Amino acid sequence: ETARPSVAGSGTTGTVSGASGSTGSSSGSTGATGASIGQPETSRISVAGSSGAPAVSSGASQAAGTSGAGPGTTASSVGVTETARPSVAGSGTTGTVSGASGSTGSSSGSPGATGASIGQPETSRISVAGSSGAPAVSSGASQAAGTSGAGPGTTASSVGVTETARPSVAGSGTTGTVSGASGSTGSSSGSPGATGASIGQPETSRISVAGSSGAPAVSSGASQAAGTSGAGPGTTASSVGVTETARPSVAGSGTTGTVSGASGSTGSSSGSPGATGASIGQPETSRISVAGSSGAPAVSSGASQAAGTSGAGPGTTASSVGVTETARPSVAGSGTTGTVSGASGSTGSSSGSPGATGASIGQPETSRISVAGSSGAPAVSSGASQAAGTSEATTSIEGAGTSGVGFKTEATTFPGENETTRVGIATGTTGIVSRKTLEPGSYNTEATTSIGRSGTTHTDLPGGTTIVLPGFSHSSQSSKPGSSVTTPGSPESGSETGTSGEFSTTVISGSSHTEATTFIGGSGSPGTGSRPGTTGELSGTTIASGNATTEATTSTETRIGPQTGAQTTVPGSQVSGSETGTSEAVSNPAIASGSSSTGTTSGASDSQVTGSRTGTTGVVLGTTVAPGSSSTGATTGVLINEGTRSTSLGTTRVASGTTYESGTSNSVPSGGSGTPGSGINTGGSSTQVTGIQTGTTAVGFGSTLLPGSSNTGATTSPSERTSPGSKTGITRVVSGTTVASGSSNTGATTSLGRGETTQGGIKIVITGVTVGTTVAPGSFNTKATTPTEVRAATGAGTAVGATSRSTGISTGPENSTPGTTETGSGTTSSPGGVKTEATTFKGVGTTEAGISSGNSPGSGGVTSSQEGTSREASETTTAPRISATGSTSVSKEITASPKVSSPETTAGATEDQENENKTGCPAPLPPPPVCHGPLGEEKSPGDVWTANCHKCTCTEAKTVDCKPKECPSPPTCKTGERLIKFKANDTCCEIGHCEKRTCLFNNTDYEVGSSFDDPNNPCVTYSCQNTGFTAVVQNCPKQTWCAEEDRVYDSKQCCYTCKSSCKPSPVNVTVRYNGCTIKVEMARCVGECKKTVTYDYDIFQLKNSCLCCQEEDYEFRDIVLDCPDGSTLPYRYRHITACSCLDPCQQSMT
């Protein structure tokens, strides 16, 4: 074998390449008079990571154990040569091998007898990767399963497998896909029978490549001949040839290296003459698995296999299966199997020979073939050709994949697609490969398939991701919540919670694109159970006439609560009762006439929409809505008739360049940044609607609304009556917006404008109008606030929102909105058009009185529920016969200042306004500013005081400026010191100081470095360190136990010595040295020692102690010897000074 390194992963098997192997041949000899039984060996060979499985050492040449015995015993041999490079990473990783080649020796059996003979061919279980308890064949291996030949009609079987694979990229338990493999099936035949009975039992060979628990594996690239046997009549030898070539396994735990370029040849075998008795041919059981199947065999992609066949009796023909598969890489995922395609296979042939007088039984093999990840469920890789006799389901046509039957609901695979979808077997995501074309009318569904370009999705299925191409509908499901993104050109639908996007999608007229329920032909269809989420339509989306593109579940004309008036729908859809997320359509989608593009629900004139909750809907740059069509974001309607409804709307934005033709409606909800407003009162003509919550509506640059069209945010209609407590959102119209005659551009009670703040009820709304905006006579341009160039005057407790409007804005009558009206300088109100707005100033929390102006006596004013401030700027020209309720001032051809009605302070207008004609009392001047101290006392400029840990100063403008009081930094303490902090009652800052560290013991402080004895244990001494106490225990090395009365303690009362009769005793000694002598008094140890019993922990028993009185201490002394010639000789000796009872085995002191 030749292999590259295994890169990473636990239990990862190194890939192999360039190996070739040849299978040896074997034959059985003739039989004799005695009985013989040939039992071939069971060879279990594993390359990597198999628990409890034997493995062949890399580079080793092994001959499987052979045996030679009496008649009929056959010898078998296996030749394996392997060379390995290092294993790079991972626990349980097997080094890769290379350059291996092996040849199988031949064996033959000696003469047998006329009795029964049994030859057992192998049972080959082949697995590629990661199967628990399942054997695997290394990718690219060519194997011939052991064959058997017995009595009449018994046919031997063989298997040839050749596989080539690309790398397995990532994932735990991921199996590398294989491609380009071809295999040939060896043939076998049985010889004529004789007089004796014979049984052929194939050998059991378990071969696995990687990561199988308890499963043996064959080293990649190794050439192995399974143990062969030759015995009495009819016994045939078996052989296996395996050749593998692999690329590296990249990453992942339990990942199997992919293989490529392998070829193998199958050895042949034949049986000798048999007997006339009964014969049974038991062919091998070949279990082949590719990846991750628990107890389920699978065929490696690209493998060509001929399942072992068996033949018995006259005319019995064995069956075989040839599978050749080519696969793409498996990219990622746990237990994910790469898809395969373009496979072809050839079936090996087998035949049975003539039989004799006995009965014969032929049991063909059971071949279970599985591609990926099915628990106990066999599956065939797409493109595989499989013979009958296997427990597989339907095989698709035209290259389509096959789905298993008998498990959870499996989908049907359809013509024109190379895709297999499974439901309920393994949770995952099913997608259609990019650039794949599915012709119109085709369909590919998970649970339910519909025909005619309309898709139906079961509402009770778990969420998933579906990718749809034009002209057909395709839905799938997955239980994985999260985001899903569709491939460009493929719309997507499903019930999965998350975010989905559409990119440059074209939906053909009459087709449907659903998130949960599909609209067909532009008409609304009810649906339930849709998922909340976000759907966006990106640039270039075109929805033809009659189409419906819906976000959530839609229903037709749902009514809730009492209502009056007829309900009609324009071409498009009216839906209700759904919950959706955020919808956005990006630049240049074109919506043809009669179509509808809804975020949640939409309705046209005289329709009622109830009970919906939407997110944010936006139509961006260049959106074109043809006449009669509607582009709605949330629950919108035009001219809603009477009825009580409660609706919560999201946010809708229409960007610049949007064109709405005559008769169309662009209904959008309001609410800035996805936050809906609340309480807007909108409705149709002469209709009062309460409790509707709206958000923000915005019309972008250059938007053009043609005559008769409407651009509504909260479904606001002309001549409407208000209800108390309305709240508005934020509406902006940028410069250059043109609203043609007869059209309406309604916000939430919205406005054209920018940069200003307005509030209806309590919520603040920002409005403003840019120069050049023109509203033709008869049109509606209703705004929440149109401010004038007014400079706000402040007062105590009042913050007046400053607003501004440029000149040149003309408005028309026939519309009224509650609130304050502010008209800029030079603004002209032309007959037939009314420009109304509402303003509430921040901090006041009131709504200003509205203005109702017009030329007809029938126009009435509107009074708000709260008082506020009303102002008109200078040079305002209004039409005659204006009736005002609240605080307004009107006159023909004169400039009037507003009348102020406010319980608190009132802000005045510009200087010119104060000098013009006035109606009402002038506003009182605010009191002069005064600084107040913490107790309410007045302070003068320059005064400084402290309050609540703040240092306050009265400035020259007589305003109080308070800043947090600055605290001093804590000191830095030295080694052996610690920082002590405390906070005094009269200060806001903590005060810190350093003090020496001490150790507190028994209410006594000890300085660092000091030590003291434990009063309860004199052998323990404590030392005070910077980190705390340190205990020191004194050691008494020579201390032996004795009774308390015989103990003599030292000064610390810790260690002691034992009293005994063993003591030094003086003795006179004559010393002779070099002829010189002297008599000296020395000391010796004299006394008795007590015998004790001690426990020896080494030998686990008691033993007697043998103690002797021996010297314990000594000293050197010098003496002078007298010589015979009268001279002296100095001499030194050791004088014993102490004695004790010591172990005689102890070495004496030196």
From Swiss-Prot:
Domain CTCK: 1062-1146
Chief subcellular location: secreted
The VWFC domain, residue ranges: 929-995
Positions of the UniProt region annotated as Disordered: 1-730, 776-925
Functional description taken from the UniProt entry: Apomucin is part of mucin, the major glycoprotein synthesized and secreted by mucous cells of the submaxillary gland. Its highly viscous aqueous solutions serve to lubricate the oral cavity and to protect it from the external environment.
Disulfide links within the chain: 1062-1109, 1076-1123, 1085-1139, 1089-1141
Listed Pfam families: Cys_knot (PF00007)
Residue stretches of biased makeup (Low complexity): 1-36, 46-79, 86-117, 127-160, 167-198, 208-241, 248-279, 289-322, 329-360, 370-396, 473-506, 548-558, 590-625, 790-833
Record's protein name: Apomucin
Compositional bias of kind Gly residues: 671-682
Region span, 6 X 81 AA tandem repeats: 1-368
Species of origin: Sus scrofa (Pig)
SMART domains assigned to the protein according to its UniProt record, in alphabetical order: CT, VWC
